Amino acid sequence: MNKFVLRQAQDLQAKLLKAQQELADMTTEVSSGGGAIKIVIDGQQRIRSVSISPEVINAEDAEMLEDLVMTAVNEAIHKSQELAASHLSGLTGGLKIPGLF
């Protein structure tokens, strides 16, 4: 293999590793239920915090709370994936590389 191509691959690998480390420090926040549920998630799809307003905690309506949490978590994951894709797009040229996230 050409030494130049090998060097480029090594440089790209180092840049991707650095970008992944940066994503661990980037966060986004989402909410559902008019702000009753708040989720903070980082760029590596790790949930950092969950906040639930006492007003939505009701033993007789646990299903509503479950739905609000599920909606917030799914939206948080989606936003985190968008954050990662945006951050990595300059390195990958818009290509979706399996295994990055």
Model-derived segments and their meaning:
Residues 68, 72-83:
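Stable alpha-helical structural segments in soluble proteins, enriched in small hydrophobic residues
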Residues 9, 45, 69:
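Residue-level signature of catalytic and energy-coupling elements of molecular machines
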Residues 25-51:
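N-terminal intrinsically disordered, cationic/polar leader segments
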Residues 65:
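Hydrophobic (often cysteine-bearing) scaffold residues that line and stabilize catalytic clefts
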Residues 1-29, 79-101:
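Long amphipathic alpha-helical segments used for membrane anchoring, targeting, substrate engagement
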